[in-house]
C-alpha cells in the first residue's frame, strides 16, 4: 500500500482490529480505544493495515496506523504513520510524518525517548495525544476561503464601485434677474471680507440689520427660487425670519455712514420688496370667528348666562409662537445635505461580511461536531446491544450447567442411600440398553427445553425453532418407542 492512505470505512477498520486481536490482544484493545476516542476536532483515523516489512530478512508482519489531525491543515503535512512491530510494547513504535509530495519526516519526542523506562505508563493513545497537541511549522498559509455566495456578492460590489463615478455635489443655483434688478453689484474678492449692507429704520424690511452682504444675497435668492404657489407676503416674511435676532435686546438706531461707491442704501423713496412682489388688492374678507367666541355663544344660548372665566377661552385663542426656521433655510442649508463617505461604507460592508462569515463557519463546525457525536452514540449503542445479547447467552449457559450440577448432586445423594449389595449388582444387557436409551431421552428433553427458552428470549428465529423442535421430537419418539421393548 502507498504511504498516502485513503480514508477507509469504519467497519473495515474494526474488522482489521479483530484480526489483530488473534495476534496481540493488548494492541487490539489499544486500537479499539483509539477508534472510540477519534473526533474531527482532535484526530481522525484514516486506515489501519497489516503489512509485511520488506526490508527485514525475516519479513516480520507489522501494523501501520494512518491518522490526520487539524494541526496539519495549514502545513505541508497530510497525515502521520505509526508503525507497530512485533516487539511492541518493549520497544516504542516508529512515527513518521507524510507530506503532500510523498516525503517522510521522522518524528521524535520525549515520550518516545522515555518509552523503555516507563512501558507501563505509555501507550499508543498517549502518543497520539502528544502528537496532536504539538504545534507544527505552518507553511503555505492562506486566508480562510469564504463561501461561494459571499465571494460572488463581494466581487459584484467591487465591480460596481469601480464602474460608478464619485457623487457630484450640485452647485448652488444663481439667478441673473436678482443681479440685474439690484444694479449688478460686483462680487468682492474671496480673500477680503464682504462689506456690510446698511438698512435704515424707515425701510420696508423693519428695524433690522444684517452683518454681511452674503446673507442679503441668500435672501434675494430665496425670493427668486421660492415656489410659485406662495404669495409675496409669505416670501418677504420667510426672508425676514431668517434674519430675526435670537435675543430680545431692542435694536438701536444705527448712524448712517457716508455712501460709498457700489453700495445700496434703502430709504423711503426706494421701492420696497413688498411693493415689488405684491399682488393686486383682494376683496375684503369676512372677520374670522374664533373658537372661544363660538363656545361663548353656545353657552349663552343654552343657559342664558355668560361665562365669566376666560382661562379656557384665552388658551383656545392664544397663538403659540414656535421658533421654527423658514422653508427656504431648511431647503438650502448646507447642514441638511447628505454626507456620503465611501471609506466608511467599505468599513461597514467589511464588518458585516466578517460577521456573516463567522456565523457560517460556527454553524458548519457545530453541524460537523453533532454528526461525529451522533456517529459515536450509534457505535456505543450497538456495542451495548451486543454486550446485552452476550450476557443473556452466558446466563442461559450458566443455568444449563447449574441444572446439570444439581442433577449430579441428586444422583450422588441417591447413591449414598443405596446399600452395598445394590451398588455392586451387575446389571443385565437388557437393563444396560434400557439405561442407555433413557439417557438419550433425557438429553433430547434438555435440548427441547433449551430451544423453548431461546424462543422465549428471542435469541433464535421462529422458523429455526420449529425446525429444531421437529427434529428432536422425531428422535425422542423413536427412542421412547424402543424403550417400550426393553421395559
UniProtKB/Swiss-Prot annotation:
Key words of the record: Cytoplasm, Endosome, Membrane, Protein transport, Transport
Single GO biological process annotation from the record: endocytosis
The keyword Plastid is assigned to this record: no
Task performed by this protein: Component of the ESCRT-I complex, a regulator of vesicular trafficking process. Binds to ubiquitinated cargo proteins and is required for the sorting of endocytic ubiquitinated cargos into multivesicular bodies (MVBs). Mediates the association to the ESCRT-0 complex.
Species whose genome carries this gene: Schizosaccharomyces pombe (strain 972 / ATCC 24843) (Fission yeast)
Protein name per Swiss-Prot or TrEMBL: ESCRT-I complex subunit vps23
Topology of the protein relative to the lipid bilayer: Peripheral membrane protein
SB domain boundaries: 428-487
Pfam family, one: Vps23_core
Localization per record: Cytoplasm; Endosome; Late endosome membrane
InterPro entries linked to this entry: ESCRT_assembly_dom, SB_dom
A single GO cellular-component term on record: nucleus
Self-association and partners: Component of the ESCRT-I complex (endosomal sorting complex required for transport I).
Amino acid at each position: 500500500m502507498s504511504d498516502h492512505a485513503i480514508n477507509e470505512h469504519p467497519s473495515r477498520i474494526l474488522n482489521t482490529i479483530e484480526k489483530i486481536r488473534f495476534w496481540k490482544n493488548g494492541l487490539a484493545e489499544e486500537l479499539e480505544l483509539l477508534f472510540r476516542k477519534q473526533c474531527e476536532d482532535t484526530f481522525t483515523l484514516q486506515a489501519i493495515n497489516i503489512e509485511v516489512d520488506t526490508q527485514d530478512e525475516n519479513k516480520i508482519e507489522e501494523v501501520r496506523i494512518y491518522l490526520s489531525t487539524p494541526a496539519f491543515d495549514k502545513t505541508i503535512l497530510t497525515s502521520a504513520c505509526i508503525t507497530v512491530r512485533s516487539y511492541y510494547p518493549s520497544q516504542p513504535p516508529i512515527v513518521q510524518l507524510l507530506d503532500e509530495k510523498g516525503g517522510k519526516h521522522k518524528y521524535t519526542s520525549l515520550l518516545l525517548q522515555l518509552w523503555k523506562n516507563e512501558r507501563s505508563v505509555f501507550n499508543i493513545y498517549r502518543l497520539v495525544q502528544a502528537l496532536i497537541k504539538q504545534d507544527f511549522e505552518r507553511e503555505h498559509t492562506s486566508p480562510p476561503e469564504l463561501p461561494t455566495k459571499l465571494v460572488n456578492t463581494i466581487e459584484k460590489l467591487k465591480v460596481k464601485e469601480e464602474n460608478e463615478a464619485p457623487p457630484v455635489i450640485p452647485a448652488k443655483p444663481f439667478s441673473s434677474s436678482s443681479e440685474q434688478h439690484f444694479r449688478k453689484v460686483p462680487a468682492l474678492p474671496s480673500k477680503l471680507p464682504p462689506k456690510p449692507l446698511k438698512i435704515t429704520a424707515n425701510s420696508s424690511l423693519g428695524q433690522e440689520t444684517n452683518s454681511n452682504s452674503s446673507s442679503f444675497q441668500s435672501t434675494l435668492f430665496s425670493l427668486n427660487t421660492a415656489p410659485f404657489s406662495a404669495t409675496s407676503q409669505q416670501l418677504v416674511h420667510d426672508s425676514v425670519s431668517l434674519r430675526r435676532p435670537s435675543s430680545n435686546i431692542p435694536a438701536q438706531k444705527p448712524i448712517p455712514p457716508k455712501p460709498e461707491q457700489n453700495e445700496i442704501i434703502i430709504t423711503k423713496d426706494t421701492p420696497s420688496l413688498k411693493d415689488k412682489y405684491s399682488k393686486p388688492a383682494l376683496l375684503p374678507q369676512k372677520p374670522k370667528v374664533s373658537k372661544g367666541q363660538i363656545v361663548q355663544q353656545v353657552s349663552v344660548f343654552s343657559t342664558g348666562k355668560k361665562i365669566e372665566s376666560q382661562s379656557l377661552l384665552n388658551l383656545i385663542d392664544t397663538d403659540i409662537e414656535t421658533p421654527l426656521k423658514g422653508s427656504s433655510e431648511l431647503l438650502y442649508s448646507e447642514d441638511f445635505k447628505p454626507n456620503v463617505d465611501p471609506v466608511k461604507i467599505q468599513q461597514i460592508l467589511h464588518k458585516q461580511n466578517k460577521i456573516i462569515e463567522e456565523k457560517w463557519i460556527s454553524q458548519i463546525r457545530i453541524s460537523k461536531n453533532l454528526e461525529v457525536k451522533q456517529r459515536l452514540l450509534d457505535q456505543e449503542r450497538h456495542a451495548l446491544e451486543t454486550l446485552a445479547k452476550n450476557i443473556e447467552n452466558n446466563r442461559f449457559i450458566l443455568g444449563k450447567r447449574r441444572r446439570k450440577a444439581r442433577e449430579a448432586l441428586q444422583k450422588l445423594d441417591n447413591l449414598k442411600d443405596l446399600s452395598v449389595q445394590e451398588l455392586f449388582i451387575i446389571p443385565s444387557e437388557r437393563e444396560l440398553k434400557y439405561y442407555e436409551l433413557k439417557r438419550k431421552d433425557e438429553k433430547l428433553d434438555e435440548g427441547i427445553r433449551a430451544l423453548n427458552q431461546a424462543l422465549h428470549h428471542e435469541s433464535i428465529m421462529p422458523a429455526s425453532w420449529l425446525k429444531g423442535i421437529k427434529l428432536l421430537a422425531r428422535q425422542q419418539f423413536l427412542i421412547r418407542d424402543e424403550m417400550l421393548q426393553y421395559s
